A protein has these predicted regions:
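A short linear-motif detector with a strong N-terminal bias
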Residues: 9-11, 41-43, 141-143, 213
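Short, conserved sequence motifs used for protein processing/export or organelle targeting and
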Residues: 64-264
Length: 264
């Protein structure tokens, strides 16, 4: 991935399982936020996202990428620029910060809460999910192992992305904020090599009624606080033959813990 540590390229496993559930999978959306400690208006977007998460619990997971602006951002990772530039290229954007993309596609939203809420409502209507996501994560010392588990209700091809994020970072200044500021959802690493995720089942379609798993490993950075970290797994689909991908469902858990499939 874009960072200091090596990520293993483990083979995907296929396990036949009985569904045991009725109805569709619950749809959880991914908010991709671009921010910077040097951005005066960025706290407004963070507040909008916090408001939405409070009013719609468990509907939106947020991953926050820090970029350099008006100086160096200590939480910057290389993936931030690569993804930001690609999003600006593919979708309408103004080239500035803050920037927000729901489920990794669609036009850029700056910070307006009502626009994000409208986009979420439209997403559920226009892009309903047909798959579920579960997570197993293990932490031994500074070694992390994450297993993404995916089941689909239809025969379809998917990709996946695994993020390691950290909450509760208070040691860094934030422009536009008074006094002590808490940085949450900070992306420490993306456990992938492709901006649009890694292929599930070697790029072959998933069969309905079977579970597919993919594993990634990483080494924690020395200044990361593991107790404040989470794992976010996003599963991506394409409606244009693989030219672009969007997040069709996601899930999250505390680092070292697990999360089961979510159903309506």
């Amino acid at each position: 991935y874009f960072g200091k540590e090596f990520i293993s390229q483990n083979e995907c496993q296929v396990v036949a399982v009985e569904s045991g559930q009725k109805g569709n999978f619950y749809q959880k959306m991914l908010g991709v936020q671009f921010t910077s400690v040097g951005c005066t208006f960025c706290p407004k977007l963070s507040q909008s996202l916090e408001n939405i998460q409070a009013s719609q619990p468990n509907r939106l997971a947020v991953v926050s990428f820090h970029k350099h602006l008006n100086g160096q951002d200590p939480m910057y990772i290389e993936w931030a620029d690569k993804l930001y530039n690609k999003m600006q290229e593919l979708y309408e954007g103004d080239g500035g910060l803050p920037a927000f993309y729901l489920n990794g596609h669609g036009n850029q939203i700056v910070s307006e809460q009502y626009k994000i809420e409208a986009a979420m409502k439209k997403e559920m209507t226009s892009y309903p999910t047909m798959c579920g996501v579960a997570i197993r994560s293990k932490l031994e010392g500074d070694q992390v192992t994450v297993t993404a588990r995916v089941k689909s209700e239809t025969e379809a091809k998917y990709r996946y992305l695994i993020y390691l994020v950290e909450d509760g970072i208070t040691k860094h200044f934030q422009a536009g904020a008074d006094g002590l500021y808490t940085h949450n959802n900070v992306v420490r690493a993306v456990l992938a090599n492709n901006l649009f995720g890694e292929r599930l089942n070697k790029g072959n379609a998933l069969v309905s009624g079977q579970e597919y798993t993919a594993e990634r490993t990483a080494t924690l950075g020395k200044d990361w606080v593991s107790e404040n970290m989470r794992v976010v797994v996003a599963v991506m689909a394409s409606n244009d033959g693989g030219s672009t991908y969007y997040v069709t469902n996601c899930n999250e858990c505390k680092l070292g813990e697990s999360a089961d499939y979510l159903y309506k």
